[in-house]
């Protein structure tokens, strides 16, 4: 693999938060039991004028600002989301104009549950590596859905992350990648349905754990990595328990996982989930650090990446772009009625 990697990153988390205990009280659940079950204290909620498009735009603008490159040098843009405002109309084309990209650009909305943004990353890497484009961008953004009263409601949240890929000015060089995919019916949403469904027992062992472990072990066996090689490990975060447990199953010390865990404070941002943890690590990483990144998407599949941080990251970290940690602290709490209003879940019938 020729030299290619992350040139810049940008993240966006809506300011609004609803506490898990607030949701639990509405549905008669024991708040302490729910918090302990999912290890999610609160989740981010998009504002009434926000959606996956505005979230993607904000994250992408921050990535461009940090990179200090002309937007017209971006030759491809990919958007991964489960929260498209339009059934037929791409978000990626909206971003082309909103970001001031050239019209001579590859633009595609990706689909693979929570790892669609990760697939966009590999697509961008391939085009950059081939020499067809100078820079590529992938965005993972969601305003994820959870049916009222159903357990997904405790974690489904909103946020976005954008990554710029290139050869020049690399902050995290891509060393290796490995993919593990199978037909596993753990989670789905049919056409026209407002909320997803999940296969209960399929969401754990057969889906999340099997695929993340399959991708990570496959990568380690193919390229000769050991758990001790990684400074940080970031996994998909559907709740606070799963990433910690999968790290233990892979013999990766919890100290390497905790710095990238954000789900406790903002819930599961779906396509931005693992990427948000990755962005948080990039905000603090030092040259020479090695990062294991393993997104997961229901249906099901996982990609395992290894990045090595370069000296260039020190310059990128000095910009005034908000860090993930700053956004985690910048919040406004809302109650359940405001939550329903902001998520447009109150329907009026004639």
From Swiss-Prot:
InterPro entries: ACP_syn_III_C, HMG_CoA_Synthase, Thiolase-like, Thiolase_N. One of its GO terms (molecular function) is hydroxymethylglutaryl-CoA synthase activity. The keyword Signal does not apply. Pathway: Metabolic intermediate biosynthesis; (R)-mevalonate biosynthesis; (R)-mevalonate from acetyl-CoA: step 2/3. Gene3D superfamilies: 3.40.47.10. Its EC number is 2.3.3.10. Keywords: Acyltransferase, Isoprene biosynthesis, Transferase. It catalyses: acetoacetyl-CoA + acetyl-CoA + H2O = (3S)-3-hydroxy-3-methylglutaryl-CoA + CoA + H(+). CoA binds at residue 241. GO terms for biological process: farnesyl diphosphate biosynthetic process, mevalonate pathway; isopentenyl diphosphate biosynthetic process, mevalonate pathway. (3S)-3-hydroxy-3-methylglutaryl-CoA binds at residues 30, 114, 155, 203, 236, 245, 268, 298. The keyword rRNA-binding does not apply. It comes from the Archaea. It is an enzyme of class 2 (transferase). The active site is at 82 (proton donor/acceptor), 114 (acyl-thioester intermediate), 236 (proton donor/acceptor). Belongs to the thiolase-like superfamily. Archaeal HMG-CoA synthase family. Interacts with acetoacetyl-CoA thiolase that catalyzes the precedent step in the pathway and with a DUF35 protein. The acetoacetyl-CoA thiolase/HMG-CoA synthase complex channels the intermediate via a fused CoA-binding site, which allows for efficient coupling of the endergonic thiolase reaction with the exergonic HMGCS reaction. PANTHER family: 3-HYDROXY-3-METHYLGLUTARYL COENZYME A SYNTHASE, HYDROXYMETHYLGLUTARYL-COA SYNTHASE. Catalyzes the condensation of acetyl-CoA with acetoacetyl-CoA to form 3-hydroxy-3-methylglutaryl-CoA (HMG-CoA). Functions in the mevalonate (MVA) pathway leading to isopentenyl diphosphate (IPP), a key precursor for the biosynthesis of isoprenoid compounds that are building blocks of archaeal membrane lipids. This is Hydroxymethylglutaryl-CoA synthase. The lineage of its organism: Archaea, Thermoproteota, Thermoprotei, Thermoproteales, Thermoproteaceae.
